[in-house]
UniProtKB/Swiss-Prot annotation:
Domain of life (superkingdom): Archaea
Pfam families noted in UniProt: Cupin_1
UniProt protein name: Uncharacterized protein MJ0764
Xref: CDD domains: cupin_Mj0764-like
Transmembrane regions: none
Provenance organism: Methanocaldococcus jannaschii (strain ATCC 43067 / DSM 2661 / JAL-1 / JCM 10045 / NBRC 100440) (Methanococcus jannaschii)
Length: 116
């Protein structure tokens, strides 16, 4: 078999953070945030695409005002940008994080650096 299949949790109602794919070229995470949850504020450790598949994401980059993005949106975040992802408005926010190239290719840590 040439292809490789990855599975992710479906219909989660609690917070989920799964590192699904971690190859030399790309890193793909699956995240579910119930209302009121957020990811720790951190710096993007690669060129990031946020693929929102359920709910509405509130995203704050650097010192900008927060912006809301809904399911069906793909949001690009450049390398080394301070970011905060929150679920303020939806019962469930579900999204994928695609990091390409893999952070190691940019001499960045594999896990993002948290900030205040």
């Amino acid at each position: 078999m040439i292809e490789k299949v990855y599975e992710f949790k479906r219909d989660a109602k609690t917070k989920v953070v799964e590192k699904l794919v971690n190859t030399e070229h790309v890193q793909i995470n699956h995240i579910v945030l119930p209302r009121g949850e957020q990811m720790p504020k951190h710096y993007s450790n690669s060129y990031v695409h946020l693929i929102i598949i359920k709910g509405e994401m509130t995203l704050t980059l650097e010192d900008q005002e927060p912006h809301n993005y809904k399911e069906g949106n793909i949001v690009y975040v450049p390398f080394n940008v301070k970011m905060l992802i929150q679920n303020i408005n939806s019962d469930i926010l579900e999204f994928f994080v695609v990091k390409a190239p893999h952070p190691k290719k940019l001499n960045a840590p594999e896990d993002p650096i948290k900030c205040e």
